[in-house]
From Swiss-Prot:
One of its GO terms (cellular component) is cytoplasm. InterPro entries: Ska2, Ska2_N. Component of the SKA complex, a microtubule plus end-binding complex of the outer kinetochore that stabilizes spindle microtubule-kinetochore attachments, promotes alignment of chromosomes at the mitotic spindle equator (chromosome congression) and assists suppression of the spindle assembly checkpoint. Kinetochores, consisting of a centromere-associated inner segment and a microtubule-contacting outer segment, play a crucial role in chromosome segregation by mediating the physical connection between centromeric DNA and spindle microtubules. Keywords: Cell cycle, Cell division, Centromere, Chromosome, Cytoplasm, Cytoskeleton, Kinetochore, Microtubule, Mitosis, Phosphoprotein. The modification Phosphoserine is found at residue 101. This is SKA complex subunit 2. Component of the SKA complex, composed of SKA1, SKA2 and SKA3. The SKA complex is a homodimer organized around a central W-shaped coiled-coil structure, formed by the interacting domains of SKA1, SKA2, and SKA3, each end of the 'W' is extended further by the C-terminal microtubule-binding domains of SKA1 and SKA3; the complex forms extended structures on microtubules. May interact with NR3C1; the relevance of such interaction remains unclear in vivo. Interacts with the MIS12 complex subunit DSN1. The gene is SKA2. Belongs to the SKA2 family. CDD domains: SKA2. It comes from Macaca fascicularis (Crab-eating macaque). One of its GO terms (biological process) is regulation of microtubule polymerization or depolymerization. It is found in: Cytoplasm, Cytoskeleton, Spindle; Chromosome, Centromere, Kinetochore; Cytoplasm, Cytoskeleton, Microtubule organizing center, Centrosome. It comes from the Eukaryota. The keyword Phosphoprotein applies.
């Protein structure tokens, strides 16, 4: 889950960087090649639209950031709870001299999938 969050964060950063570059290139192209082109869409309008798109990306990123933080905190709490539960089970097994039967194939698969999503365990 953390890898996905980091990947999304990098995607937003790259998108913002790409938009900055596009805006710079458009401004440069307009200044050098199309000083007074009347037949095409107004370059100033295009730049305003680009600025609006960039603003929407920044707003989306600002909304995304707290979600990413909450996901990391939730993951940490889940891992801590699972670790505590595992410790309690192990203590109970020792106190009662109880041995559990080996895991079934499905249980092993589920445990592996869980560990792959929660490497902190």
């Amino acid at each position: 889950m953390e890898a996905e969050v980091d990947k999304l964060e990098l995607m937003f950063q790259k998108a913002e960087s790409d938009l900055d570059y596009i805006q710079y290139r458009l401004e440069y192209e307009i200044k050098t090649n199309h000083p007074d082109s009347a037949s095409e869409k107004n370059p100033v309008t295009l730049l305003k639209e680009l600025s609006a798109i960039k603003s929407r990306y920044q707003t989306l990123y600002a909304r995304f950031k707290p979600v990413a933080v909450e996901q990391k905190e939730t993951k940490s709490r889940i891992c801590a709870t699972v670790n505590k539960t595992m410790n309690v089970i192990q203590k109970l097994q020792k106190q009662t001299d109880l041995e559990l039967s080996p895991l079934t194939k499905e249980e092993k698969t589920a445990a592996e999938q869980f560990k792959s999503h929660m490497p902190d365990l």
